[in-house]
Amino acid sequence: MSIQAPPRLLELAGQSLLRDQALSISAMEELPRVLYLPLFMEAFRRRHFQTLTVMVQAWPFTCLPLGSLMKTLHLETLKALLEGLHMLLTQKDRPRRWKLQVLDLRDVDENFWARWPGAWALSCFPETMSKRQTAEDCPRMGEHQPLKVFIDICLKEIPQDECLRYLFQWVYQRRGLVHLCCSKLVNYLTPIKHLRKSLKIIYLNSIQQLEIRNMSWPRLIRKLRCYLKEMKNLRKLVFSRCHHSMSDNELEGRLVTKFSSVFLRLEHLQLLKIKLITFFSGHLEQLIRCLQNPLENLELTYGYLLEEDMKCLSQYPSLGYLKHLNLSYVLLFRISLEPLGALLEKIAASLETLILEGCQIHYSQLSAILPGLSHCSQLTTFYFGRNCMSMGALKDLLCHTSGLSKLSLETYPAPEESLNSLVRVDWEIFALLRAELMCTLREVRQPKRIFIGPTPCPSCGSSPSEELELHLCC
């Protein structure tokens, strides 16, 4: 029978302070730092809003990582803390103990709260905090430095979440005193006018990851280009299912030119993903030549590109060090793959992931990319399913992977010889051909995880992935 440990003296002292909110408020200025975190956590748990309002005004650390304590924002708690910050920001003479530079509403630092109570007496905080934060994120707090509020934002619908709407209004009313910093911003279904309102409030230089979904390309370019140009610290830029209904190729070209000029300002961009790439067909070079920083990840998926678009991929230094290249479901069967082969040769020393699934590549085109592919010594993932391959072409492809010792996940289509007149797999024939392909592969190297066959699996509907056992269910 276990005996519950008695409360520590620190815990008892904190509980005593919280019994009388007036007493705890008057004691904040002189409260030992070792008591501050347990007392704050207890006030937070009991929702003593008045105590929280005062505690934030005397916060003795450079950062208050509230998001890791409050997984889901609670409106009344947020109001109490922001009220305390408002009272503080409007004072000419701030409390001598106040060191707060950052209110972090992201779920990023659980360790901060796990270190109480004893560890705080031994730690030299905020020196330990400074190791975790960069100068860019938390500059030295001078008299006129704005308070930084960090949050990741996902705009899904209108009306917005109550907490987010309140926070936006609070920051807007304190322009110059507060910077709303958003390292990750995702826009799903919010109308463009509401997204623009949000961008007017957010400190644009803080955005490192931006994802925009389901918008019209012409409206996006006309309405958001001026904001994108100011996101100078952007690392990841994703456009998913942005559409267009234009038939004027000349007008499309002018819009792409305007849009491409944005990339002249994005000197830290590492990932560019465009799902539904057809809008850039015939104009892709305008975008690629404006890229300022060598990309690590390029994803141009779903749609079609012209041969001139493919040629430009190997001609600019910004794509010379790619680690991840995804061209899935870009229809390539009508164009020469020599430009793609040239790109693979160029990035062979760095490429780790290559996804060419669903490109409808014909076996007659395959020879153009095999030399480049065979030199990709760092390749760990290769998706090549849903392409039209003969048995001979697949054997040739597998033999050209003999030097790719780091390959740990690879997928290939069923050979066309295993398909019947209805273009469906004849499983009896397929089993024999698959065994022959595996025998060919094992003669040159030992595969780790490999999937050969139609995707998704006709039995269970699954597609191969990192989480899926790579075998046919049938």
From Swiss-Prot:
The keyword Repeat applies. GO terms for cellular component: Cul2-RING ubiquitin ligase complex; cytoplasm. It comes from the Eukaryota. LRR repeats lie at residues 15-38, 204-229, 271-294, 319-342, 391-414. GO terms for molecular function: ubiquitin-like ligase-substrate adaptor activity. InterPro entries: LRR_dom_sf, PRAME, PRAME_domain. Keywords: Leucine-rich repeat, Repeat. The keyword Repeat applies. GO terms for biological process: negative regulation of apoptotic process; negative regulation of cell differentiation; negative regulation of DNA-templated transcription; positive regulation of cell population proliferation; proteasome-mediated ubiquitin-dependent protein catabolic process. Belongs to the PRAME family. This is PRAME family member 14. The lineage of its organism: Eukaryota, Metazoa, Chordata, Craniata, Vertebrata. The gene is PRAMEF14.
